[in-house]
């Protein structure tokens, strides 16, 4: 499974109305391809979102709060992309960051990218099941229309230098 998108409270309708369905799917597929097995995910994510025109702004569109450096990973036509691939537990902070932008009128919906990798010892079920329960439990604090994209990026692949190709 490369990635899975879960839509909550009609976020898919907002994305459809903004004619961003294909754009979002191709962006998430590109992020998945670029980050799978990588070590430096933060920089690669910024580069991928920049190449897909999610970071192209001159008017502070990425900013969450005026006068602060808090920024989304990307924004396009009122849809923000936020995420963290280190820990699934970023779901709470990520949803909060999106909700602040929504409440301030900066965005209409958001996509939260998370890792689907969690401890095999977890008794809480799959990341998909947990995301559904947590978004429901966070209502009414998190009340916006939001989508969650779960990625299985695998562990970093570190080359030992014996592969064919290169110089």
Which residues fall in each region the model found?
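Short catalytic-loop micro-motif centered on adjacent basic/acidic residues
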Residues: 80-84
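Conserved beta-strand signature within the Rossmann-like core of class I S-adenosyl-L-methionine
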Residues: 106-116
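Acidic-basic catalytic patches of nuclease active cores, encompassing PD-(D/E)XK
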Residues: 1-63
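Arginine/glycine-rich "motif VI" loop of SF2 helicases in the C-terminal RecA-like domain
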Residues: 101-107, 137-142
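Active-site metal-binding core of divalent-cation-utilizing nuclease and nuclease-like domains
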Residues: 35, 42-77, 87-96, 103
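Short amphipathic alpha-helical segments and helix-helix/interface helices
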Residues: 46, 98-99, 132-136
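Domain-level recognition of nuclease-like catalytic cores that cleave nucleotide substrates
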Residues: 117-167
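Short acidic, S/G/P-rich loop/turn micro-motifs used as interaction or catalytic elements
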Residues: 86-90, 117-120
